[in-house]
Amino acid sequence: MAMLQTNLGFITSPTFLCPKLKVKLNSYLWFSYRSQVQKLDFSKRVNRSYKRDALLLSIKCSSSTGFDNSNVVVKEKSVSVILLAGGQGKRMKMSMPKQYIPLLGQPIALYSFFTFSRMPEVKEIVVVCDPFFRDIFEEYEESIDVDLRFAIPGKERQDSVYSGLQEIDVNSELVCIHDSARPLVNTEDVEKVLKDGSAVGAAVLGVPAKATIKEVNSDSLVVKTLDRKTLWEMQTPQVIKPELLKKGFELVKSEGLEVTDDVSIVEYLKHPVYVSQGSYTNIKVTTPDDLLLAERILSEDS
């Protein structure tokens, strides 16, 4: 296993070809690091007839399970996925946004992209990203069975979600919002939150808090210890009926409210939000340590 130090940090891969620093991945995929490692570009020399095989081989952890219509949990082709891929990833301390950093040879954002693309419930994926990185997703447009659209990211998360919401199909029955920096979400959990979102109107994946959490004041003094049994850590996807999300955005915009996640928009409407229990492996990759943990989880799964 070779190791290369670049602006992205240390990257491991079976093969490196100099001087263009092309990294050979799996059997078919190649990454090119160009323009001082500012953009990740797929080589056009990849034979398109192999892309489906490469896709299936590269995402075993999250979407290798086959699907048939009997497993559809909501109406087929009724879900619009908004994949948030416009963050800067400053905590990763790398020159490239975290969602495009290779994770075992594949950009982080592509893991969940492929997972959603193989679900029969999904009609389309709206990728909210800088146009500079669109070709990473466009390379697979002919190999997936969903529509692919794009939206421009906003200044804050809620602005990016709103931008993506403007691009969804008007006939979609559910909006499924996901952070592309969570590559390890599995199909079973997605199906669970889709079903709950359809039933309640809004649902979010979450896991019970494992750590002791204390409320602390501005002087760094403990105010009280919170009851861990009532605390859950929120994840994504977060699933909301589009008419409910649009109504929530109207309220947020009219009152100048700021929210840190999507179901918070619905909470302002006093509408119930269901928490679907997810998996602790559905981590958000925001630091180098997270990247190492994700690699370990993927390696163990394979």
Curated annotation (Swiss-Prot):
Q: Where is the transit peptide?
A: 1-61
**Catalytic activity, reaction form:** 2-C-methyl-D-erythritol 4-phosphate + CTP + H(+) = 4-CDP-2-C-methyl-D-erythritol + diphosphate
Task: Fetch the SUPFAM superfamilies from UniProt.
Answer: Nucleotide-diphospho-sugar transferases
Per the record, the pathway is: Isoprenoid biosynthesis; isopentenyl diphosphate biosynthesis via DXP pathway; isopentenyl diphosphate from 1-deoxy-D-xylulose 5-phosphate: step 2/6
Q: Which UniProt keywords apply?
A: Acetylation, Chloroplast, Isoprene biosynthesis, Nucleotidyltransferase, Plastid, Transferase, Transit peptide
Which residues of this protein are annotated with the site description Transition state stabilizer?
Answer: 91, 98
Q: Which GO terms describe its biological process?
A: isopentenyl diphosphate biosynthetic process, methylerythritol 4-phosphate pathway
Q: What is its cofactor?
A: Mg(2+); Ni(2+); Mn(2+)
Please tell me which top-level EC class this enzyme sits in: transferase
Instruction: Give a GO cellular-component term.
Output: chloroplast
Function, as annotated, reads:
Enzyme of the plastid non-mevalonate pathway for isoprenoid biosynthesis that catalyzes the formation of 4-diphosphocytidyl-2-C-methyl-D-erythritol from CTP and 2-C-methyl-D-erythritol 4-phosphate (MEP). Is essential for chloroplast development and required for pigments and gibberellins biosynthesis.
Q: Which PANTHER family match?
A: 2-C-METHYL-D-ERYTHRITOL 4-PHOSPHATE CYTIDYLYLTRANSFERASE, CHLOROPLASTIC
State what protein this is by name: 2-C-methyl-D-erythritol 4-phosphate cytidylyltransferase, chloroplastic
Whichever gene encodes this chain, its name is ISPD
